[in-house]
Amino acid sequence: MANPLLCPLLTEKSTGLTEKKGQYVLVVRPDADKLTIKDAIEKKFGVSVTSVRTINYLGKLRAQNTRRGRIIGKKSDWKKAIVTLAEGQSIDYYSGTAQKSEG
């Protein structure tokens, strides 16, 4: 299977989860399972993952009216993973490395 991690999901809510609870929100491949996501994060960032929660989103139907009639399409399905790291560990999304805070 290809790398299940696609990109971080940076929203106000996900940033708040990162700051308060040490949880990171990522967009992952829809066919990825929790163990695959956990292994990929531990391998890529070198951190220990405590838990992984996943949420499946179904793509919405979209319609567009044109001169030739109505065209109906569908947005892709996607999956979100909320990953909790061990105490004192963090991930820097932009450099792709993990940081351990001392204290």
From Swiss-Prot:
GO terms for cellular component: ribonucleoprotein complex; ribosome. One of the early assembly proteins it binds 23S rRNA. One of the proteins that surrounds the polypeptide exit tunnel on the outside of the ribosome. Forms the main docking site for trigger factor binding to the ribosome. Gene3D superfamilies: 3.30.70.330. The keyword RNA-binding applies. The keyword Transport does not apply. InterPro entries: Nucleotide-bd_a/b_plait_sf, Ribosomal_uL23-like, Ribosomal_uL23/eL15/eS24_sf. Pfam families: Ribosomal_L23 (PF00276). Part of the 50S ribosomal subunit. Contacts protein L29, and trigger factor when it is bound to the ribosome. One of its GO terms (molecular function) is rRNA binding. Belongs to the universal ribosomal protein uL23 family. It comes from the Bacteria. Keywords: Ribonucleoprotein, Ribosomal protein, RNA-binding, rRNA-binding. GO terms for biological process: translation. The gene is rplW. This is Large ribosomal subunit protein uL23.
